[in-house]
Amino acid sequence: MITVSRNHVAASWLGPAVARVRAIPCATPLVLGAIVFALVGSAEPTAAAATGLASTTMLADAPSTPDGAQPRLASDPAQLADDLVADERALRDPSTGEAALMAAAHREQVAYRAIGRHPEWDATTRPRIPPSLLGIYDGNVDARRQLTAMTSVRGTLPAWRVEPPAPADELLSYYHQAESDSGVGWNYLAAINLIETRLGSIDGDSTAGAQGPMQFLPATFAGYGQGGDIHSPHDSIMAAGRYLAANGFASDRDHAIYRYNHANEYVHAVDQYAALIAADPAAFATYYRWDVYCYTTSGDVLLPIGYAATSAIPVADYLATHPQ
């Protein structure tokens, strides 16, 4: 059974004026059985003032924006790059309204996914990015390519539920609490949370049995969770901090991240997203708005908030009733 609804974020904190990690494709897990999903495709918070999440359900047969429909981007790489620049600027403009921020973040995510799969476009797209945005562009494209390299194309969609993540200010408080307790940088915990489950939006076990927002194997969580709940954002983020600290994060950060997931590509992607989240005031707010995608035999498939499947679904069957 599949159910789908569309959910929108309504949080004053998420505006670019605030100072301050799928769609990552569905992935085959490593070590902790990471769900490396494409959200993939974050700023340095101090005291974030966020509201909760407000949802609006849209009928699946709505003619203008069918439920689960992806943003439509230019097919020409040069125009795609120009549109991406416009969206990146809108995401950093304090006057941009929430609806426009959401739309820009969704387009940005899809653009980075497309550019990530087409390195032959680099000679066209990269020169069109202004110097002020080039670091953001390079970091996102590189992270996307690293994650793509470690994931497999799927013929079925996973048995997941896609739900709104915890409120942004709550997640930020958990990352900072874990940093204070473990010494592991808050931005690295956010990057891992982003890559693993799109900040907790994906509710589903990996094929290796990893669970929860930070994708722990139950046996591993038992050693670092201090009796907490593997499905709790707070408890799993705190456990991730302890795990990384115990594996030498302070002296060899990349080794500790590799212990979390045995893939050099994973380590590199975490490093890139963590750097972006720490350096760019708009980054986390933008990533928080990203969707969940799976890279399939039919291309990218958007799994919107409200997607729920109790067993794997052939991609063609899903697309027959949920056009992209």
Give short role names for the model-derived ranges.
Residues 1-21:
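N-terminal secretory signal peptides that target proteins for export/translocation
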Residues 22-36:
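Sec-dependent N-terminal signal peptides
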Residues 37-62:
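C-terminal region of N-terminal signal peptides and the immediate post-cleavage residues
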Residues 295-324:
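Intrinsically disordered, low-complexity polar segments
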Residues 61-172:
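N-terminal export signals and maturation junctions of secreted/periplasmic proteins
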Residues 120-304:
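Catalytic glycan-binding domains that act on GlcNAc-containing polysaccharides
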